[in-house]
């Protein structure tokens, strides 16, 4: 008669080997801080960003994203470089600036995910246009025109990418993603293919190239193309779960021409 064996304890599942998938960024932040500001992010469906200014560092933002503010905060114009190019493209030629002390709240008119990106001196990040919510005045702002993959998807002239850089001082930029936002940290040489409407930000160290797959069937021949953006590390890539395809800048230019003020008051 065989001797009974003690029951074996269940083994923990093995962790998958190889590159890790993108991870979900926090959807709510009870309290965060950066030089000159404190902030919190609340809400699930349409989150709200609350920023408290100590009076030393202003924040700048697009004029249509303010939800409420304390009356003592002063509002002014935040000058930007390349105003003429932005005007021609149908983009706003200035942003709004708030100075404290006091509190101000921001929100976009769409469901999504609001999150911060902190930048240390020497760091810079590129962001798809119309996904920037607010930034501290310690950051330098610029923009570039994205071509290549943009030419195939958004018209012959491409679209703009916002650039935020911490030149001398630490700063933070808050972004709005559609759906939820995941982050992938790429090792040097590591790659990930992302649907063109799915990326929201990337470190400047990350290279982005178009990747096109021709789809064919045995009966009908060509069945179209499947296009991705291929990102190559090192660095971070932000991915939003709800695809957002920008209108072409040609359409933006036509909208600007239909207004007597050009792109001055466009989103």
What kind of region is each of these model predictions?
Residues 2-267:
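Composition-driven recognition of glycine/serine/threonine/acidic- and proline-rich low-complexity segments
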């Amino acid at each position: 008669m065989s001797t009974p064996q003690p029951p074996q304890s269940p083994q923990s599942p093995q962790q998958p080997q190889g590159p890790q998938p993108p991870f979900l960024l926090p959807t709510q932040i009870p309290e965060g801080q950066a030089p000159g500001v404190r902030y919190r992010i609340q809400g699930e469906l349409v989150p709200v960003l609350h920023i408290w200014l100590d009076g030393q560092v202003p924040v700048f933002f697009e004029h249509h994203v303010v939800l409420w503010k304390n009356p003592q905060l002063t509002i002014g114009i935040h000058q930007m470089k390349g105003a003429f190019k932005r005007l021609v493209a149908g983009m706003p030629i200035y942003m709004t600036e708030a100075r404290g002390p006091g509190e101000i709240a921001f929100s976009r008119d769409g469901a999504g995910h609001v999150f911060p990106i902190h930048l240390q001196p020497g760091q810079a990040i590129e962001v798809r246009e119309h996904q920037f919510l607010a930034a501290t005045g310690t950051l330098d702002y610029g923009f570039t025109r994205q071509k290549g993959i943009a030419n195939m998807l958004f018209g012959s002239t491409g679209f703009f990418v916002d650039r935020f850089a911490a030149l001398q001082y630490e700063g933070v930029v808050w972004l709005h993603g559609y759906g939820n936002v995941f982050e992938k940290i790429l090792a040097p040489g590591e790659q990930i293919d992302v649907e063109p409407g799915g990326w929201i930000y990337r470190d400047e160290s990350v290279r982005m190239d178009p990747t096109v797959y021709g789809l064919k069937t045995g009966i009908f021949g060509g069945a179209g193309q499947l296009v991705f953006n291929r990102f190559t590390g090192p660095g971070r890539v932000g991915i939003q779960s709800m695809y957002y395809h920008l209108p072409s800048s040609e359409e933006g230019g036509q909208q600007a021409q239909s207004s007597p003020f050009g792109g001055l008051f466009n989103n």
